[in-house]
Amino acid sequence: YGVIEGNLVYVYSQDASVLGGSIGEMHAKKITNLYDLAMKTGAPVIGLIDSAGLRLQEATDALNAFGEIYMKQTLASGVIPQITAVFGTCGGGLALVPALTDFTFMEGKKAKLFVNAPNALAGNEISKCDTSNAAFQSEEAGLVDFIGEESEILSQIRNLVCMLPSNNEDDNS
């Protein structure tokens, strides 16, 4: 957790340099515990994503972990603000995480957001239509609220946290 301009926030992230930033059972438990604390204190959750997705070595434990994250997100929906920033890969089951948040930001050049890789779609190739890039996700899918460089995204998130109420019972914002 931390503070942005006096506002308590809870932040989680994936480090792509460690196991590709993949999510397994223990990483998911940290995220779900963070959601529990955020709900208890009525503070926003910010996710910073650069991940290969599911940790395949953990098989069904990792799949269950994704389900636990989704459940916490749905319980938090409408109660606390949820913000996601995608700075690298956000694929497979992890692609649902930004879809379940209130605000989604994407880095404009290297971020990719997809359930299935664009080449997995019949008749599509990345050279024809990259359905995973920020422009497509913003303009066509309507999932992304802001595209920019990492520093711009972090600045926009700080501004957003200062404008939003901390939770559904906050009358001070």
Q: Can you name each region flagged by the protein language model?
A:
Residues Y1-S77, Q82-I83:
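Long, structured ligand/cofactor-binding scaffold of large enzymes
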Residues I49-E169:
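Conserved catalytic cores of soluble enzyme domains
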Residues S173:
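Active-site loops and adjacent core secondary-structure elements that bind or stabilize anionic groups
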